[in-house]
């Protein structure tokens, strides 16, 4: 289910009260489930397109065209920040913090089932799609053969997973992280920057969620086209269970923490680079405004 446009299609986390009642599992246990779900492979497949997405993010938020040096700085910051080693440590910690022993046991049983294995394989297949093909799928230009019964199942799956809500949540979280990191790297006060990014995101959240619902259903239908109706029902049953809801809550928390860390790292590196470029530009402009340095003429010697 990965591509940047829908890095996650899993539900938002449970309430703080429910999380407080959990007895988190250890890191080794979480890492085993993380491996079973092929999270690393799916995230790694999404990272290659991140520099282009970050460039678009900045190009869409400026009224003046970015210079080649600024675009290069954005690209370099994204390449260095959006890496699996930056993602994995915070992601695994968050994953472990949102899991308990019963959830792990039932999630492992589901992932070991035929339907669970086919779901993971389908997720990996979606992760290998190019951005161009992913866009075509979400726009309906590429579609899987469907039936009214399957359409109903995918509508239920999208609602059960709250895929639109979670995708928007990740996009806004990462955007805020990049903005905050850029402020820190530029030696600006991060508080107002973070608040503006948060308010901007909240004002558009509902519209973004509604606009994503149908594209997300198309994406799921295409990715799971080789799963039978029985498989889809098995997946839906797990997702609607208590353990399933907790598992996808942990999955979302994991991805949210990992992408926040990468976004923050990207912003900090970018802020430093943009500050250096601005200082160099200011020095150049100052030098151009100053009158050229001339050597004073030799004093006239008195005539003897």
Task: Kindly label every feature range from the protein language model.
Residues 5-15:
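Bacterial N-terminal signal peptides
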Residues 36-43, 75-82, 91-95, 106-109, ...:
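Second-shell loop/turn segments in exported
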Residues 29-44, 132-178, 269-304:
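An acidic-aromatic pocket/loop used at catalytic or ligand-binding sites
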Residues 21-131, 266, 289:
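N-terminal Sec/ER secretory leader and immediately downstream segment
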Residues 198, 206-304:
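A cross-kingdom marker for long, charged
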Residues 127-225:
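Extended amphipathic alpha-helical interaction segments
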Residues 122, 127-135, 139-142, 146, ...:
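Outer-membrane beta-barrel domain signature
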């Amino acid at each position: 289910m990965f591509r940047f446009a829908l890095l996650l299609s899993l539900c938002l986390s449970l309430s703080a009260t429910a999380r407080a009642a959990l007895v988190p599992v250890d890191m080794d246990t979480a890492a085993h489930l993380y491996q079973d779900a092929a999270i690393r492979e799916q995230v790694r497949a999404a990272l290659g397109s991140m520099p282009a997405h970050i460039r678009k993010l900045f190009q869409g938020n400026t009224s003046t065209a970015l210079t080649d040096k600024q675009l290069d700085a954005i690209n370099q910051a994204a390449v260095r920040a959006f890496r699996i080693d930056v993602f994995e440590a915070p992601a695994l910690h968050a994953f472990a913090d949102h899991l308990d022993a019963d959830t792990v046991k039932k999630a492992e049983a589901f992932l070991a089932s035929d339907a669970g294995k086919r779901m993971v394989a389908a997720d990996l297949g979606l992760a290998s799609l190019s951005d161009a093909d992913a866009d075509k799928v979400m726009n309906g230009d590429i579609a899987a053969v469907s039936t009214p019964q399957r359409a109903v199942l995918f509508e239920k799956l999208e609602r059960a997973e709250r895929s639109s809500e979670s995708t928007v949540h990740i996009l806004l979280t990462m955007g805020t992280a990049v903005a905050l990191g850029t402020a820190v790297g530029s030696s600006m006060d991060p508080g107002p920057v973070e608040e503006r990014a948060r308010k901007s995101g909240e004002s558009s959240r509902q519209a973004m969620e509604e606009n994503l619902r149908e594209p997300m259903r198309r994406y799921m239908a295409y990715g799971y086209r080789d799963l039978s109706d029985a498989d889809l029902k098995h997946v839906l049953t797990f997702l609607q269970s208590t353990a399933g809801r907790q598992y996808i809550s942990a999955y979302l928390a994991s991805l949210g923490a990992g992408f926040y860390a990468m976004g923050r790292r990207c912003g900090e590196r970018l802020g430093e680079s943009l500050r250096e470029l601005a200082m160099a530009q200011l020095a150049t402009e100052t030098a151009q405004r100053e009158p050229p340095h001339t050597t004073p003429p030799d004093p006239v010697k008195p005539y003897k």
